[in-house]
Amino acid sequence: MLWRKQKGGVVEKLQYWVWLDEGTKREEVGPLMLEGIAPQLLESGLHGLIMDLDDEFATIPSPVPAPEGEHTPQALVSLWVDCYDRRGPVEEILNQCAVRLEGYQVIESLYSDYGMAKWSAPRNWPDGQRSPGILTVATFDQLEGTDFESWLRFWHDHQSPMSEAIQPRCRYVRNWAVRPLNPSNRALKAIVEEAWPSPEHVTDPHKFFLSDGDNDVLSANVTTMLEHAEKLFDMNTMRSLTMSEWMLKTLRGS
């Protein structure tokens, strides 16, 4: 996405999925990424940096778990640069820890932010402090056999407001992956970051679907979600992870 910097000019958003050594423990992810990698990235002149980490604070299971035994990424690194063509130094830094790295040039829609809904107050914590609650981060490709514009319209005009109405989201960052930065990357069109008030709002179905203990409402909301999902992606290739959000350098200005 093109963002206007505070002092003029525009920047682009890139997102990198980072796979660490298989067997890396959750309590090792934070020190590695926040203390080892993030300072180097910040020194490289980035305009903004956010890390979503599968760390010791993100222990609850995903609502849509990956197949048993699959090696899933442990970090999603979002960064803002002047020009994606000069991303080489960034990738060199990330490759210090990554056994696999997949980057995408994305267009971001900040559909909702902290303080816009009743589920959270406006952000009041500084850069470098973990965001409260928990994230779910989903990836999916365009559903095979669909027209792109119709698919995109359904995602943006129907799925986004529907899920906003029946789920307790604090923040919803909708990233449209317009192109992979390496041809060997997975085919993705969407990287969706959703923040929730607490882990219990993800693990408790009645809280996750705002049914207030009513099983009929729960069933109706789950059915609505599944019907929308079937028009968006293949459940066999869609992935969802629970992660911690770390805003390390907020992009200023607009």
Region roles according to the model:
Residues 2-254:
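Macromolecular interaction modules
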